[in-house]
Swiss-Prot record:
This is 7-cyano-7-deazaguanine synthase. It holds the Pfam family QueC. The keyword Signal does not apply. Keywords: ATP-binding, Ligase, Metal-binding, Nucleotide-binding, Zinc. It comes from Aeropyrum pernix (strain ATCC 700893 / DSM 11879 / JCM 9820 / NBRC 100138 / K1). Binds 1 zinc ion per subunit.
Amino acid sequence: MAVCRAVSIVSGGPDSFTYTLIWLSRGCSVHALSFNYGQKASREVLTARKLLEKADELASERGWGRVLEHRLVDISFMKSLWRGTQLTDEEVEVKEDYAPSVVVPIRNVVMLSIAAAYAYSLLEEEDVDRVVVTYGAQRGDIKPRPDTGEPLYPDCSPECIEALQAAFRLCHFRGMRRLEVWSPSREGLSKSDLLKWAYGTVGKLIYDTWSCYLNGKYHCGRCESCINRHRAFKDAGLPDCTRYEKPPGPEAEFESRGDYYVHRSCREA
């Protein structure tokens, strides 16, 4: 039987978590990496750990690949270099709508380079037939900017991924050049596609993911990521049981439950 390993970048959000589940379901055992890069939403790392523990339980029950480990990679020193971005710079406000300042320059390239280095180490240590590096970039991340026509997040594009894969192979020994880099965007999958797959496969666990750019008790409901999360649940035709501090859509569509809001599509108490 072919042995597959995936080095999966898992942020705690629905995209990277679901895509990791997909590779587990394909029979690949996962070495999960989460990154502390000085982001404001530091709770996403703790979320990733809890989700991966549950994912491994499900994988064991279903005969999938296993979550072999979860490593936290500390690159928080990059915060001082990634200035002027909404996600790391305390002096830059997190906005409701997309703005180029939400893009952390080639953040995914940095993380994928580290993941690829680890993946090559696995190829040298183990008898592995296939090794893939995965991350959660999805089709919505590469919609064209209205002003320039280029992807909203350039390092999420299939072109970037394929170029990186080629570079990673070129930059190591010929006998090791079988490393693959994959993302939902490369497979043509959107956030709503991922939510539908996850909801149909692991059910309510998808609500435990964390999308918000901030670090509050609940999803803020105001940042671009919260708004995109809610829109994707609607596009997928799924109830959104996420707890929001403020409604990420028309207030009439949400129900106040004490100190948070939930969309009326959610029937949970």
